[in-house]
């Protein structure tokens, strides 16, 4: 197994087998501006028999302060919208690669050969400096915003977890 690690938002993710990970943000298609304004998660990884779309954030806005100013309200909505867009765009791009609608030369044979009709797809946001009480709030907001996409792709779960939980789950070193 050739190991792969990556640093995102001040956290070291991995070590993953290089055949288990697709660095969507580092792909040529993404880097070459294939689609302007495309927003993606950090990477897609085959982890513990699940396909995980993983986004990393260093912190969240404090949702309890959203009514304190127009700027705080805008930051709050931008945070939710940004993550939702990243998951939507990433799922669309990834599955266009898997189905061969776009060149999939950067995707490992292992990922290409998974039986996508049977695997669980999970959306994960790892937040380094999370307000613990805000994780459920943000998860619920993202569930509402992503419910259609989650139904289309039969995604059962979205998780917002802090760095400590990510370490216990084997995402972060």
Task: Report the location of each language-model feature.
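Short, flexible loop/turn motifs enriched in small residues
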Residues: 38, 46-49
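Polybasic (Lys/Arg-rich)
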Residues: 132-173
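Conserved catalytic cores of phosphodiester-cleaving nucleases, focusing on short active-site segments
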Residues: 43-45, 52-58
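Catalytic cores of nucleic-acid endonucleases
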Residues: 59-126, 148-154
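Residue-level detector of short, conserved catalytic/binding motifs and their immediate flanks
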Residues: 39-41, 52, 121
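Basic, amphipathic N-terminal segments that precede the first structured/catalytic domain
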Residues: 1-41, 171-173
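Short beta-alpha junction loops
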Residues: 127-131
